[in-house]
Regions:
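Short hydrophobic/Thr-rich beta-strand motif most characteristic of the beta2 strand and flanking loop
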Residues: 31-39, 46
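Active-site residues of response regulator receiver
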Residues: 58
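The feature encodes the CheY-like receiver
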Residues: 62
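Conserved acidic carboxylate
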Residues: 14
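Charged docking surfaces used in two-component/phosphorelay signaling
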Residues: 21-25
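A Lys-centered signature of the CheY-like receiver
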Residues: 103
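Non-catalytic signal-transmission and effector/linker regions of two-component phosphorelay proteins
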Residues: 1-11, 42, 106-120
Length: 120
């Protein structure tokens, strides 16, 4: 059995508490350590310094966009996927080529996205 230190660490930026709790459980069951942030400031703090391997970023975090977090992750070479209920045309053009999990998504879609990030 893996110890927490051996598990890939994922930053989960999600402001909907119930969804965040469900995702945290699903991710932990799939073998990830999870660092959660529901607000942009906390997400930025974790993105800048935490030892994370990948991230799921809700685009809208309590009325603030997570694009600054994505810039930090990109600078650190940490892969990420956006999670959004927005239609593609509502995502700024500069970010449309990034991986986007369209809400609602299922376990299969989540696992495929995360596997793709880890293999990239």
């Amino acid at each position: 059995m893996s110890t927490d230190e051996n598990m890939p660490c994922i930053l989960l930026a999600e402001d909907e508490m119930l969804l965040a709790m469900m995702l945290e459980d699903r991710l932990h069951t799939s073998g990830y350590r999870v660092l959660k942030a529901a607000r942009l400031a906390k997400c930025m703090e974790l993105a800048e310094s935490a030892p994370i391997d990948l991230a799921i970023l809700d685009i809208n975090l309590a009325g603030e966009v997570s694009f600054p977090v994505a810039l930090v992750l990109r600078r650190r070479g940490i892969p990420f996927v956006f999670s959004s209920g927005y239609d593609e045309q509502d995502v700024p053009e500069a970010w449309r080529n990034e991986n986007i999990l369209q809400k609602p998504y299922d376990s299969r879609q989540l696992n495929a996205a995360l596997t793709g990030l880890l293999e990239a």
